[in-house]
Design a protein with these regions (language model features):
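A residue-level marker of the well-folded mature domains of exported/periplasmic proteins
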Residues: 1-106
Length: 106
């Protein structure tokens, strides 16, 4: 998160108006850089942690896309059972979706 914060701070200094963090570390780094800059920069992230949820609650990150681990686990087990029983497991990739979390959905 520290390196991501430095990178995000550099972008903010150059006038960037929006930053996307592609994982927890870069999302936290982006939120912390926005907080320290005291400027209006839109931060959007990917992943879910208590730190990210607090950054959203405090207005430093607009939203984050969170994976659905329960769906991932369910679909994984379903595919494993089918494979063990010799059945066709279907698609090579299974879209388990994401949930968008913002202040309104906290």
């Amino acid at each position: 998160a520290a390196k991501s914060k430095d990178i995000a701070a550099n972008y903010i200094t150059q006038g960037c108006v929006g930053i996307f963090g592609a994982n927890e570390g870069s999302t936290v780094g982006t939120g912390n850089a926005i907080q320290e800059a005291g400027q209006t920069v839109i931060g959007v992230g990917f992943d879910k942690s208590d730190t990210i949820l607090n950054l959203i609650k405090n207005g430093y990150i607009l939203c984050t896309m969170a994976q659905n681990p329960d769906v991932m686990g369910y679909e994984g087990i379903q595919s494993a059972v089918k494979a063990l029983e010799g059945e066709d497991v279907g698609e090579e990739f299974i879209d388990t979706g994401v949930s968008v979390i913002n202040k309104d959905t906290l």
